[in-house]
Design a protein with these regions (language model features):
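ATP-binding/catalytic-site motifs of ATP-hydrolyzing domains
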Residues: 57-59, 63-64
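ABC-type ATPase nucleotide-binding domains, specifically the catalytic core motifs of the NBD
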Residues: 12, 68-70, 93-109, 119-122, ...
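Short beta-strand immediately N-terminal to the Walker A/P-loop
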Residues: 30-31, 80
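The feature captures the beta-strand-to-loop junction immediately N-terminal to the Walker
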Residues: 33-35
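Helix-to-loop junction immediately C-terminal to a conserved catalytic motif
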Residues: 48
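ABC ATPase NBD coupling module
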Residues: 64-85, 111, 125-129
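Conserved structural motif at the start of ABC-family nucleotide-binding domains
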Residues: 2-4, 17
């Protein structure tokens, strides 16, 4: 079960999430609806560890996900594919690629092989141009 308890998050002193709590049971499907800027993407990115939360707790079963990249927690079993095929500049190229693998429950053997051939994949996206 995914348990979110009282999470809050801010960007540049602007509160984006304030005291968000919800429980999602295994097998349950949840849709997030809201206007632009309501915090839907921030909530999803918070669950994935891509956005820092200021307070509260995010747990999947007994694993606390706060401030961790979800794809680095094997027992987590969740992935996130951003709309519009966006990448995350704060992550390494390798981590961006792994996001898609975890979302599809795919093996990362091919990715590990590619990473061994191209060391540039171990650098952060924001260090790249073009």
């Amino acid at each position: 079960m995914l348990i979110i308890e009282g999470i809050s998050s801010s960007y540049d002193q602007v509160r984006v999430l304030s005291g968000v709590s919800l429980n999602v049971k295994e097998g349950e499907v949840l849709g997030l609806l809201g206007r632009n800027g309501a915090g839907k993407s921030t909530l999803l990115k918070s669950i994935m560890g891509l956005v820092k939360i200021d307070e509260g707790t995010i747990k999947l079963d007994d694993v606390v996900l706060n401030q961790k990249l979800a794809h680095e927690i094997p027992e987590c079993g969740i992935g996130y594919i951003p709309q519009g095929r966006r990448l995350f500049p704060e992550l390494m190229v390798e981590e961006n690629l792994k996001m898609g693998l975890y979302a599809r429950n795919s093996s990362n053997e091919v990715l590990e092989w590619a990473l061994s051939l191209f060391p540039v994949l171990k650098t952060r996206l924001k260090q790249k141009s073009g």
